[in-house]
């Protein structure tokens, strides 16, 4: 009985989220927005920053709870022009039903963790300095390295979707002010910069529902460092355990 009720609950939730996956499901760039036609049905666009590159490949999770860590399907789009200007990314990572995404947790050194709402959807957000050595988007629009070591400052927004099989990550970046090497001890006067940066980040993305979508083609863009599309950026997963008490 409990198993039957669980099935009915899942079916009802899927209908609310936009219907079951089918052969017609598409995910990728359409009209300069990332579109997923189901699970969930969503359209995400970046405001005021031109599209640079994007496509589909796989992530590499190393810290999953069990042996045989998953290699999620990763759809990602990058928006930006150069390392002196803002940059934004949209990432949708999907695991198979052997796994589920854990709750969103901040990266080491992150600050200002909070819940925010973008386009009516709830996200967990935090701000951090991007380490260039393992940045999956390093070099796509260049790196802010003028006048010595420098970093991107990033505002990271993430939410789990589709019964925790999917995770949507929105990230907005700007070149960090020169001399900013840590967010826990900002030089005097830079706390105001961080606050204003976070406000700009929240306005960078628009969410909606996809309308009629034409054919989407996904390639594997070579300029994204897929080997670093790992736990540090994507987050971690846990393996589903069988319920031996289920009737």
Q: Would you name each region that the model predicts?
A:
Residues 2, 29-31, 146:
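Intrinsically disordered, low-complexity segments enriched in polar/charged residues with Gly/Pro
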Residues 10, 40, 160-162:
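Generic marker of residues within folded, mature protein domains
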Residues 15, 22, 83, 112, ...:
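Polar low-complexity intrinsically disordered regions enriched in Ser/Thr and small residues
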């Amino acid at each position: 009985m409990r198993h039957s009720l669980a099935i009915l609950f899942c079916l009802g939730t899927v209908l609310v989220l936009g219907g079951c996956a089918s052969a017609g499901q598409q995910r990728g760039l359409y009209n300069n927005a990332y579109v997923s036609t189901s699970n969930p049905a969503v359209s995400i666009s970046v405001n005021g920053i031109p599209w640079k590159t994007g496509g589909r490949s796989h992530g590499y999770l190393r810290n999953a709870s069990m042996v045989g860590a998953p290699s999620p399907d990763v759809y990602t789009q990058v928006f930006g022009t150069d390392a002196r200007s803002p940059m934004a990314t949209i990432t949708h990572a999907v695991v198979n039903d052997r796994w589920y995404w854990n709750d969103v947790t901040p990266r080491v050194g992150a600050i200002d963790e909070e819940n925010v709402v973008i386009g009516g959807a709830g996200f967990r957000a935090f701000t951090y300095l991007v380490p260039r050595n393992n940045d999956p988007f390093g070099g796509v629009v260049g790196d802010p390295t003028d006048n010595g070591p420098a970093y991107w400052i990033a505002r990271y927004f993430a939410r789990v979707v589709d019964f925790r099989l999917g995770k949507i990550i929105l990230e907005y970046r700007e070149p960090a002010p020169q001399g900013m090497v840590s967010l826990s001890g900002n030089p005097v006067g830079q706390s105001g910069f961080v606050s204003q940066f976070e406000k700009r980040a929240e306005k960078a993305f628009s969410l909606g529902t996809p309308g009629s979508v034409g054919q989407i083609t996904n390639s594997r863009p070579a300029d994204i460092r897929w080997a670093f599309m790992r736990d540090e950026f994507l987050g971690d997963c846990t393996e589903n355990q069988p319920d031996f008490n289920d009737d």
